[in-house]
Design a protein with these regions (language model features):
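Non-catalytic cap/lid and distal C-terminal segments of serine-dependent acyl enzymes
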Residues: 1-159
Length: 159
């Protein structure tokens, strides 16, 4: 953050905050930075991520893993935390297919959708079809679908 955010700020002439984008493990990272630092990011497009860090550690968790596990840190965020208003002014898009190799992404996105609803966070959780697999061909289609909505502002506060 100490290097990449100033680098982007020097070159960004739009006046808009950057959007974190990623697929698979990159989706988890995009979600983490957008949710941990809504002051620095205008949102995220997270495709086919797993948002429970304990998945990668066999259930083991410490404070560092917790801080990087959206399913955990959001669950325990107070419902009146000032970040929630910031989230609702951002484009938070989480999508997953329902085809091959997407099962863990589906289960953690269902958890995230439930947390978002309970906290009043207007993130867009989109579950694509049963033919949509954990693959680049689909991520290319998804980014072409979501990016224009982020750029025109129609994804802000989307339910």
């Amino acid at each position: 953050m100490d290097e990449v955010i100033p680098f982007i700020a020097q070159r960004n002439t739009s006046g808009r905050l950057p959007i974190a984008v990623g697929c698979s493990l990159g989706a988890m990272h995009a979600g983490i930075v957008a949710l941990r630092r809504p002051d620095l990011f205008g949102g995220c497009i997270a495709m086919s991520g797993i948002y429970d860090a304990s998945y990668f550690t066999g259930g083991w968790m410490n404070s560092k893993w917790y801080d990087n596990s959206p399913c955990h840190f959001l669950q325990n965020m107070p419902s009146d935390h000032y970040y929630i208003n910031m989230y609702n002014e951002r484009s938070l898009i989480f999508c997953v297919g329902q085809g091959a190799w997407e099962q863990n992404g589906i289960s953690t996105l269902l958890i995230m959708a439930s947390i978002f609803q309970k906290k009043g966070i207007h993130a867009w959780c989109d579950f694509w079809g049963y033919d949509v697999s954990h693959d680049w061909d689909w991520w290319k289609k998804q980014i072409r679908y979501f990016l224009p909505k982020v750029l025109d502002g129609s994804a802000i506060g989307n339910k």
